[in-house]
UniProtKB/Swiss-Prot annotation:
It comes from Bos taurus. It holds the Pfam family L51_S25_CI-B8. Residues 123-159 are annotated as: Disordered. One of its GO terms (molecular function) is structural constituent of ribosome. It comes from the Eukaryota. GO terms for biological process: mitochondrial translation. Its main location: mitochondrion. This is Large ribosomal subunit protein mL43. One of its GO terms (cellular component) is mitochondrial inner membrane. The gene is MRPL43. The keyword Ribosomal protein applies. InterPro entries: Ribosomal_mL43 (IPR039927), Ribosomal_mL43/mS25/NADH_DH (IPR007741), Thioredoxin-like_sf (IPR036249). Keywords: Mitochondrion, Ribonucleoprotein, Ribosomal protein, Transit peptide. SUPFAM superfamilies: Thioredoxin-like. Component of the mitochondrial ribosome large subunit (39S) which comprises a 16S rRNA and about 50 distinct proteins.
Amino acid sequence: MTARGTASRFLTSVLHNGLGRYVQQLQRLSFSLSRDAPSSRGAREFVEREVTDFARRNPGVVIYVNPRPCCVPRVVAEYLNGAVREESLNCKSVEEIATLVQKLADQSGLDVIRIRKPFHTDSPSIQGQWHPFTNKPTALGGLRPREVQNPAPTQRPAQ
């Protein structure tokens, strides 16, 4: 796919993160799993063993566990910007679920898309971007404006 066909945006920081204090973007994790389904065994073990450690490491994240007779276990992540991500935990081990949940906690909730420029500022310079000839005098060899240069000598007809 070409660059014009893919979504892109400029580099921004979510809620100006890093200025002041860091605010984790993950707001809520909801686990839906079955008590007896074999596909939910890894999710049940994660909830029994690892979810308290995750909650201690991430005190700003609210964790809900919904035991219900469902066929596919899943985790739903809700972010501060309103984005909702749903991931399936079907037949995954405890380690795979732990890495998935940590990945959801580290994300900002924004879609992963192409960044147009690797730099961004809210107050761009009035002078423009720097280049090697920024502070060089313009009176060098061929850099003078045309109206300042001496015109070519004109030949006068003989009288």
